[in-house]
Amino acid sequence: MRGGTSKGVFFVDTDLPQDPTLRDRLLMRIMGSPDPYGKQIDGMGAATSSTSKVVILSRTSRSDSDIAYRFGQVAIDSPHIDWSGNCGNLTTAVAPLAISLGLVKAPAEGIATVRMWQANLGKRIIAHVTMQAGEVVEAGDFELDGVTFAAAEIRLEFLEPGGGGEADQGDVAMLPSGRVLDLLDIPGLGTVELTLLNAGNPTVFIAAQALGLTGTELQSDINSRPELLARLEAVRAHGAVAMGIASSVEDASRHHRVVPRLCFVAPAQDYQASNGRPVSASSIAFNARIISVGQLHHAMTGTGAIALSVAAALPGSVVNRVLKPDTETTHLVFGHPSGTLAVGAHLSQRDGQWTVERSVMSRSARRLMQGWVFACV
């Protein structure tokens, strides 16, 4: 399935071993991992963080959900699947596939509203999927920067995305430190201002200027500079420790490579997207770039977009401070390497604490193939 700007291999839980160790061993072999050559030639993966992903669908007995799913980020060069976070892009593909497989009921015509349970994070998500003649509509005119072809729009609502976390991590607060802005000492950078946020996925936000960057960089500007990538990883790893996700920076870099993400932001500027299309500062509220598993993402992760929408609405956050004046945070557009993306968040204060009611965005998804996959285990 393609979901948003990512691709992954989807399974139904009853088709997989129930033992987690056996399940993960099979999934890694299907994807072609671990591969010391970094290519996943002998599997279904495509050797990037955006394409080395698996999703497992399962029926649910929860009264507030129609389908449950788990997301796994499959390491390319090491024998590991990280089940600690979510992929907001592949979330888009869960509902249409569940409908097509008969796992959930949907109207023959109109909009199917599918309530999803994200089992990694313990969060509810609602997808709105267009139906026609009893089938999911995939063709359409919705354009998503980072995806070449237009498709049908799928609107997503992430309900109360702030806080939460893996079962073995406990319930992590939306602002783990209790502050909108934190000061951390990073070797090679000195004292830097960060916003540490748990919404969508745990994310560390930093101003591009603090890194000596403009915020308009493309993949070739970042991923070809190992010394810069090491500096970015140092910021992310220190943020992971401050958020309580890792016990040390070494632990963060070795065992927590997927979350937290690192996102750097800058005021709106003109730039050229990766497809050569100009993006004008007048069309966006700010610029954002996100690091995914050690590399600059080609567009924007779905969960990164959620975190950005929430951070933008938090007064005084790193993201909020680069917004254009009078930006409406319930619907804003930001720039990323492949173009632009519209997101929005609805926040409120209760007893002096910020809470997120929902974050919304639109993506698209398409079934690329369905059938048997073979693996030698």
What spans do the regions from the language model cover?
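A glycine-rich beta-to-alpha transition motif near the start of alpha/beta enzyme domains, typified by
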Residues: 1-377
